[in-house]
């Protein structure tokens, strides 16, 4: 949702929902936070996105200026974009409609900070003439690792179907390590690296 503090305070549905969740102070906090930012001539990252979107949306002459300036737009890691970023890109593409995005829906791991996977899953709805090029060969991992990853990913209800493969060696079986904390996990992995170096004479590189 893209709401300024003023829009938030005037939205009856939001205020009702906040009251139901016993978080009515959200409105007051947002207003005071916005006031402090304005007094300091400051914006946080969310403000930058929100105000950029509103600037383009509410000022056609500015939107046309920048949409005309950027004839080609490339966005990397599109699976990690949020709602505001998706709308900003849409505003900038209105004139030339030349957009190239790179991304992997199977690597969307930042929803906790606002990333919206539907941006990449539903991209063809926003751009009906979209062409998709699937880069399915993996050059980094063995086929054993790729097969294990595929077996997990194929259960995703919403995804862009891919047949990822590797032409590298089959590779060793994947060991399963059970640990009770991140510290224990790090300890086990570090000791395994030390043991591998001692036994096989392997390099840390």
Q: Language-model segments: which ranges?
A:
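Short, glycine- and charge-enriched coil/turn segments that flank and shape catalytic ligand pockets
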Residues: 14-20, 60-61, 129, 198-201
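Helicase P-loop NTPase motor core
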Residues: 128-131, 136-205
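Solvent-exposed, flexible loop/coil residues
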Residues: 6, 12, 47-49, 113-116, ...
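Glycine-/small-residue-rich beta-strand-loop submotif within the FAD-binding core of flavoenzymes
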Residues: 125
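Upstream accessory/linker segments immediately N-terminal to the RecA-like ATPase cores of bacterial MutS
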Residues: 1-13, 18-27
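Short linear capping/connector segments at secondary-structure termini
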Residues: 11-17, 69-71, 105-106, 165-173
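Conserved helicase NTPase motor core
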Residues: 18-122, 134-141
């Amino acid at each position: 949702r893209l709401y300024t503090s003023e829009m938030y305070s005037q939205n009856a549905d939001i205020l009702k929902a906040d009251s139901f969740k016993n978080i009515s102070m959200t409105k007051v906090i947002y207003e005071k936070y916005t006031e402090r930012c304005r007094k300091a001539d400051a914006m946080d990252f969310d403000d930058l996105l929100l105000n950029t979107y509103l600037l383009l949306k509410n000022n056609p002459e500015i939107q046309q200026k920048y949409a005309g300036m950027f004839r080609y737009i490339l966005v990397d890691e599109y699976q990690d974009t949020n709602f505001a970023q998706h709308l900003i890109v849409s505003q900038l593409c209105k004139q030339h409609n030349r957009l190239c995005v790179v991304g992997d829906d199977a690597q969307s791991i930042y929803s906790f900070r606002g990333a919206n996977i539907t941006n990449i899953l539903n991209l063809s709805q926003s751009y009906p003439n979209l062409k998709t090029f699937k880069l399915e060969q993996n050059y980094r991992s063995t086929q054993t690792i790729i097969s294990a990853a595929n077996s997990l990913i194929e259960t995703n209800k919403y995804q862009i179907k891919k047949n990822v493969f590797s032409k590298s060696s089959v590779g060793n079986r994947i060991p399963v390590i059970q640990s009770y904390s991140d510290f224990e996990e790090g300890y086990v992995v570090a000791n395994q690296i030390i043991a591998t170096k001692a036994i096989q004479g392997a390099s840390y590189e």
